[in-house]
A protein has these predicted regions:
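Start-of-domain marker
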Residues: 3-70, 255-262, 280-318
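A short beta-strand motif characteristic of beta-propeller blades
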Residues: 6-14, 57-65, 110-118, 157-165, ...
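Repeated scaffold domains used in trafficking and secretory/extracellular systems
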Residues: 15-25, 67-78, 117-130, 167-177, ...
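Post-signal peptide N-terminal segment of secreted/secretory-pathway proteins
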Residues: 17-147
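Short beta-strand elements that form the blades of beta-propeller/WD-repeat-like
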Residues: 24, 28-43, 80-94, 131-142, ...
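Beta-propeller blade signature
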Residues: 47-55, 98-108, 148-154, 196-209, ...
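Solenoidal tandem-repeat scaffolds enriched in leucines and small polar residues
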Residues: 126-240
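Conserved blade-ending motifs and adjacent loop-strand segments that build the rim/top face
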Residues: 213-225, 277-320, 393-410, 437-470
């Protein structure tokens, strides 16, 4: 069961809605919290606080680093010797080139340094990855095409890498593979503005191409979000969602941030010297997949089955999901592909309009209002080394509607068990599975402790969870807490809290 660690909670006051706060874990060496403060220096630069914490979430060190005002935190990555925190100026004009600032932390000598970079006009910084002292940024040009910007942190050198793709393309996903010290890039290839194929490149840590592959799209279907792995023979294996594609021409702007595509299945791909192997599993062919559906979709599936039994329909319709970024977990010698399903929720409102002067006969005007995203289910599919689907299951957490997309759940292996957990409303909900996909525990709900005994929960935003080290996890988010015993009876804080699974 999950157990809390007494007093292992760290809080930072939240002073504004746009304030940034982020925690970068360093494993058994603790971690670092980066907080945007209200303070500025004489040059009107914003002061960011970098707080070093140990594994008990005790503060070891605090440093204030000035950066230009109105920056937003983009992302951070860490390796055994380095940590990099990237910031962007999102208030710049659309015609301006993209300027970023990076704060690097040399963990070996505990020293900070900063550098700034300028990307081409109207380009889009997609993602960042770090292996040892090599930082890579993947950048898309607004009209198509892209490049990798490589930074050698040890020798302060930079160079640009452009993938060798003949047709139009965009960089879709880019990830670091720390075990092999390589980077994997997936780029979408377009012919006459139609998504035709996905190109895969494996780069060494110094930027050399060591593998290059191409996967052609099927009829009306293409690869969506994906995860990467290498088998024992160092062959690239891809676990990807399968998205339905129309024959209409597309625009590449904003495509990497588009999560609205309907996913109809999952595709397993292995690139080998003897040829490419691929296996596709459609959701409509998976037994018991209806448990992962919303109530309205379950009703639709039951009606279809009834029509098929009555001979009124010959073929089962597609079962589709919208997925947030999938994840891959190594469990019992197999790979578990996990994706969170969500749907946007709307409601309609009607008001009466009486014309400009209010003298005409009234008439109703109906419009749609966006309520938020509902993360209603998490789907797990387990594959062996040859791409055979061993088992699948789903987990449902009752989540409040949210106004943006972020990961609501997390999966990890602890004590030879697969733990699926999700924080929410100052509780931790979790389920446990064995290597055969058998549920060992029904969904458990564990209340979490506060900083003080007289604290009480008021509200929560952006709650998340991730693996820290060993069997320890970190719950993080933003909370509004009440305490009648304190001078300020209500406080809003960013927090991190340690949880152990025993």
């Amino acid at each position: 069961m999950a157990q809390q660690v007494e007093t292992a909670r760290y809080e930072v006051p939240r002073w504004g809605k746009s304030q940034s706060c982020h925690f970068e874990p360093f494993g058994e060496q603790g971690g670092m919290m980066v907080v945007e403060t209200e303070k500025t220096n004489e040059e009107k630069q914003r002061l960011w606080e970098f707080v070093t914490l140990d594994t008990s979430l005790y503060q070891l060190r605090s440093d204030l680093i000035p950066l230009p005002d109105k920056l937003t935190f983009f992302d951070s990555k860490s390796s055994p010797h380095w940590a990099v925190f990237l910031f962007l100026n999102e208030k710049q004009q659309r015609s301006d080139s993209v300027v970023f600032w990076a704060v690097t932390y040399n963990r070996s000598v505990e020293e900070y340094s900063t550098f700034t970079g300028r990307l081409p006009e109207r380009s889009i910084l997609q993602s960042m990855a770090l292996i040892d002292g090599t930082l890579m940024l993947s950048v898309n040009n607004k009209g198509g095409g892209g490049f990798l910007s490589q930074y050698d942190l040890n020798h302060q050198r930079q160079r640009t890498i452009t993938p060798n793709i003949g047709n139009d393309f965009i960089l879709f996903q880019f990830e670091a593979m720390p075990a092999s010290k390589e980077f994997v890039l997936a780029a979408r290839e377009f012919v006459d503005k139609h998504y035709k194929a996905t190109r895969f490149f494996v780069y060494s840590h110094d930027g050399r191409v060591v593998q290059s592959h191409r996967f052609e799209n099927g009829e009306n279907a293409g690869l969506g979000r994906m995860c990467f792995a290498f088998d024992t023979l160092h062959r690239l294996t891809v676990y990807a969602t399968l998205e339905r594609e129309s024959n209409r021409k597309v625009t590449v702007e904003g495509m990497t941030a588009d999560f609205s595509k309907e996913v109809v299945g999952v595709t397993w791909i292995r690139f080998a010297a003897e040829g490419t192997q691929a296996k596709t599993y459609l959701f409509k062919n998976l037994p018991d997949i209806d448990r992962a559906l919303t109530s309205s979709d379950r009703l639709r599936v039951k009606e279809e089955l009834l029509k098929m039994q009555q001979g009124k329909k010959k073929e089962k319709g597609e079962i589709t999901f919208q997925f947030y970024a999938p994840r891959l977990v190594d469990f019992a010698g197999h790979h578990v592909f996990v994706a969170e399903a969500f749907q946007p929720i709307y409601h309609t409102e009607t008001r009466m309009d009486y014309g400009y002067y209010g003298i005409y006969r009234s008439y109703p005007v109906t419009y749609t209002v966006f309520d938020g995203y509902d993360f209603f289910s998490e789907i797990l599919l387990t594959f062996d080394d040859d791409g055979e689907l061993l088992w699948h299951t789903s987990v449902r957490f009752e989540n409040a509607l949210c106004d943006r997309l972020w990961a609501h759940a997390y999966e990890a292996v602890a004590h030879d068990e697969l733990l699926v957990a999700s924080p929410g409303e100052h509780t931790l909900r979790y389920e446990v599975f064995d290597a055969d996909g058998v549920q060992l525990l029904n969904q458990q709900v564990m209340p979490m402790d506060f900083m003080y005994g007289t604290d009480s929960y008021d509200d929560e935003y952006d709650a998340g969870l991730y693996r820290w080290y060993g069997n320890s996890f970190l719950v993080h988010g933003c909370q509004r807490v009440q305490n009648p015993k304190l001078r300020n009876t209500r406080r809003t804080v960013f927090y991190v809290q340690k949880i152990q699974y025993e």
